[in-house]
Amino acid sequence: MHDKILILDFGSQVTQLIARRVREAHVYCEIHPNDVSDDFVREFAPKAVILSGSHASTYEDHQLRAPQAVWDLGVPVLGICYGMQTMAVQLGGKVEWSDHREFGYAEMRAHGHTRLLDDIEDFTTAEGHGMLKVWMSHGDKVAELPPGFALMASTPSCPIAGMADEARGYYAVQFHPEVTHTVKGRQIIERFVLQIAGAKPDWIMKNHIEEAVAKIREQVGDEEVILGLSGGVDSSVAAALIHRAIGDQLTCVFVDHGLLRLNEGKMVLDMFEGRLHAKVVHVDASDQFLGHLAGVTDPEAKRKIIGREFVEVFQAEAKKLSKAKWLAQGTIYPDVVESGGTKTKKATTIKSHHNVGGLPETLGLKLLEPLRDLFKDEVRELGVALGLPPEMVYRHPFPGPGLGVRILGEVKREYADLLRRADAIFIEELRGTTATAQDAAAGLCGEADVGKSWYDLTSQAFAVFLPVKSVGVMGDGRTYDYVTSLRAVQTTDFMTAHWAHLPYALLGRASNRIINEVRGINRVVYDISGKPPATIEWE
């Protein structure tokens, strides 16, 4: 049985980052809404509780409080931002509006040598004070400490930026240790979880396989399972894990909608049929998908058509497998949280995710989601431990509608064929080019990145087909062909992103190869837009 950390979500947009930092310390945790019942908290039996931030104010919403059971359990509690403020209010302190709201970078002084912050610092002042570079985002502030608490940290604008009652194991910080902008944030969360809470660091993917396999076998018994295999990381790892558990009781359905990457179908079939000896039904439905997309230019309409047709094709194949009683999906933990699918109804729906609803009820199947407790990085670790090749497990994200949202405007087979080849060349150049000391000296990458491929140094890279033509010259003749844009970004969370500063030589080779090898494209441009204001995908 794993030790567990309970994260109570008060509505912060970065609560998932708290969970990721805890998991990175190899400790299991779950996110639940702040208004879970006292019985739920007691039954969860956490080693510690973390209270998240919130957009709310302690003045405006007196319902946003931690359950009383949190304070009755006798376990350590860490409050972050709003979590600090509700801790103060609930335990007898005072919170008030701040005349100097803090949003962004701040330098914070640590006080009192508490267990949480002792010896954790970014620099020391001339007076010998330990300082931390942190990220603030608050309009209220704690004005009066609760009984039993001592000052732990301060900034010029926030005299009480941290507080601690070490006898009870209660700590609170006004900054956000979960975000990368707080330089020592990961170290702070790790210290709370491992040293203060004493949680065992035994949440390791290699060991998780045995537990997951046993759970799948217990759920499924001798019944059969059907899974939609897309070639993406999540469905591939889910398929490999379920196949490890129940073998031929699993049938994978791979639908080719005509909008896959170059040779993607062959790679998936070689992997699952060839290496894993799994049962795979391959459906070429490209004519059906492309036929329904003809004349459609609106991005959202294209997404809906592709989603609708996938469901139709998958349903038709599923009905042929009359013995199947389970539908398996590659749902991962962020999907569950973002869809309001945590174990209570409080979670706010940020987006409706395709993996969390729909098909099981339509088909009358039970739902099997073996990855629903894992973050993406954990899914990748699990895939490697299951023996999937790194080039499959560490592939860049690929949208569900495939090339359909990387072809601007109407989708045609001709456009998809051109884009597939251009995209493959760009990815090949990224994989085949390693960062050099000269790249590091020019500020394109860090010194630690020298020797890594530029594919691994970018978070997502792809080509986009633009349905416009431009004049060119090839040989002695005039050309009038299509334009493609290359896009590469670097990000830690995909919520914001910077365009990747790739070496000019790499971009030049990719451009030359695309223009020379892909007949029909005579101009290549590079997208240098960040997110925001642009999104990563063009549609």
From Swiss-Prot:
GO CC entries: cytosol
Catalytic residue list: 81 (nucleophile), 176, 178
Coiled coil regions in record: none
Molecular functions (GO terms): ATP binding; GMP synthase activity
Keywords recorded for this protein, A-Z: ATP-binding, Glutamine amidotransferase, GMP biosynthesis, Ligase, Nucleotide-binding, Purine biosynthesis
Residues annotated to bind ATP: 230-236
Pfam (any one): NAD_synthase
Pathway: Purine metabolism; GMP biosynthesis; GMP from XMP (L-Gln route): step 1/1
Acyltransferase found in the keyword field: no
Protein name in the entry: GMP synthase [glutamine-hydrolyzing]
Organism for this UniProt entry: Burkholderia cenocepacia (strain ATCC BAA-245 / DSM 16553 / LMG 16656 / NCTC 13227 / J2315 / CF5610)
